[in-house]
Amino acid sequence: SAGQNAKRSIVEGVTNGDVIVIEARDVPDAGTVGDIYALRAFHLGAVGIITDGALRDTEAIAELGKPVYHRASHGSTWGRRHMPFSHDEPITCAGVFVEPGDVIVGDTDGAVVIPHAIAAEVAAEAEAQEHREAFAIERVRAGESPQGIFPLSEERRPDYEAWSK
C-alpha cells in the first residue's frame, strides 16, 4: 500500500544519529512502529524513537536496548488509524513542536526537544548546571543541608568556585 511504502521509505532513510519522532495525534489504539521496523531503524543508525501514539511489540523493542518513548502499547497495526505521508518536516508530537535538526535529549524521566537554533547555548548552560549539581551532591553526601547549595546561593558561591579549581 502507499502508506506501507512511505513507512518503508522513511525507515530506510534513517542515518546515523537520527531520532525518529512520530506524530500520531495522541492516538493510543494503533501501533506506529513494531519490532521489525524498530530493529531496522536502529541497525541503520537511529538512536531513539519517540511517538505520542502507541507502539507494537514493546517487549521486543525494549530488548533492543535503545531509548524509546511512547504513549501506549497496542497490538493493532498502524494502518488502522495512521497513514504516513511525509518526513523531515516540522511536526507537533505530544504538544511539542519539533523540526528536523532539533536536538533531542532523553533519559528515564522523559525527553526534551531543544531547537537547533539555541542548542549550543542550552548545552553550555546544561553543562554548567551539571557542574553545580555535582558540587551540591558532594556537599550533601558530606552531611550538609542543601540550603544555599542547591540552588547555589551567592553566600555559597565562593565555596563552589574554590571547589571548581
Locate each region found by the language model:
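Channel- or pocket-lining gating/hinge segments that regulate access to a cavity or pore
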Residues: 109-112
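Feature captures the catalytic cores and cofactor-binding loops of soluble hydro-lyases/lyases
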Residues: 1-100, 114-147, 151-165
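C-terminal binding/interaction regions
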Residues: 104
